[in-house]
C-alpha cells in the first residue's frame, strides 16, 4: 500500500543516515545510499539470529559466541588504499562496519556485553536502527 511504501522509505532513510555517519578514514564516510540494501540484509541477519537465540533461551555466553562468530566472518587485512577504493565502488559497508554498525544497533548485544554509554560501540537506544 501507499502507507507501507512511505513507512519503508522513512525506515530506509534512517538506515542511510545511520551508516553515512561512519567515518572510515580521515574525511571519508560510508555512502549510506550505495550500501543501504546490503546494510538492511546485515541488520536483518543479526536480528534474526538474536531472535532465534532468545527464543531458544540461549545463555548470554552462547549469544556472545554467536556474535563473535559473526564478527569472524568479516575479519580481513587490507591496505588503506584498498579500503578507500572499496568505499567508492562496493555496495557493502566496509567489513569492520558490517560488524560494529550492526551489533551497535542490536539491543541483545548491549545486554550480553553490559555496554554502557561510555563504551565506544554504544549508541543511544533511540538512534539504533532496526529492521523488524
Regions found by a protein language model. Give the residues of each.
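Zinc-dependent metallohydrolase catalytic domains
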Residues: 1-132
Amino acid at each position: 500500500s501507499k502507507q507501507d511504501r512511505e513507512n519503508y522509505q522513512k525506515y530506509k532513510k534512517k538506515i542511510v543516515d545511520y551508516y553515512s555517519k561512519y567515518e572510515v578514514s580521515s574525511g571519508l564516510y560510508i555512502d549510506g545510499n550505495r550500501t543501504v540494501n546490503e546494510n538492511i540484509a546485515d541488520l536483518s541477519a543479526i536480528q534474526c539470529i538474536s531472535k532465534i537465540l532468545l527464543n531458544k533461551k540461549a545463555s548470554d555466553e552462547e549469544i556472545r559466541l554467536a556474535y563473535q562468530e559473526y564478527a569472524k566472518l568479516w575479519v580481513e587485512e587490507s591496505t588503506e588504499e584498498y579500503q578507500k577504493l572499496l568505499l567508492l565502488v562496493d555496495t557493502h559497508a566496509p567489513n569492520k562496519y558490517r560488524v560494529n554498525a550492526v551489533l551497535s544497533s542490536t539491543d541483545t548485544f548491549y545486554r550480553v556485553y553490559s555496554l554502557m554509554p561510555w563504551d565506544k560501540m554504544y549508541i543511544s537506544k533511540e538512534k539504533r536502527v532496526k529492521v523488524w
